A protein has these predicted regions:
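Acidic, polar-rich N-terminal leader regions of halophilic archaeal proteins
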Residues: 1-104
Length: 104
């Protein structure tokens, strides 16, 4: 796969943040709200501040854990944003892990 096949990591971090920021506009369950808010804050920080690949992978992994722990949002559109964010985050982790493993 060439570099032109997928958006740059920075663009996908922006998209991750946008998906999570969109959940803040939705009437989500209180129990899910704290997890989503923390995940959105981590994603915002990643989108705004450059970091080395290991740090990005670690922090995106934290986003994934938070999203999985969020539970039911009780809002279908928020669930769609969470699913899209999870897909983006898991893809980023896989890509960053693959780039680490290329030398092995």
């Amino acid at each position: 796969m060439s570099d032109g096949d997928e958006p740059a990591v920075g663009d996908r971090l922006d998209a991750l943040h946008e998906q999570l920021a969109a959940t803040a506009e939705r009437p989500v369950a209180r129990a899910a709200s704290a997890h989503l808010g923390e995940a959105e804050a981590v994603a915002r920080d990643l989108a705004e501040r450059p970091a080395d690949p290991d740090t990005v992978r670690e922090r995106v992994g934290h986003v994934v854990r938070l999203l999985r722990e969020a539970g039911d949002t009780e809002d279908e559109r928020a669930d769609e944003h969470v699913a899209a964010a999870l897909e983006l985050a898991e893809g980023l982790i896989a890509e960053l892990a693959d780039s680490d493993g290329e030398s092995t």
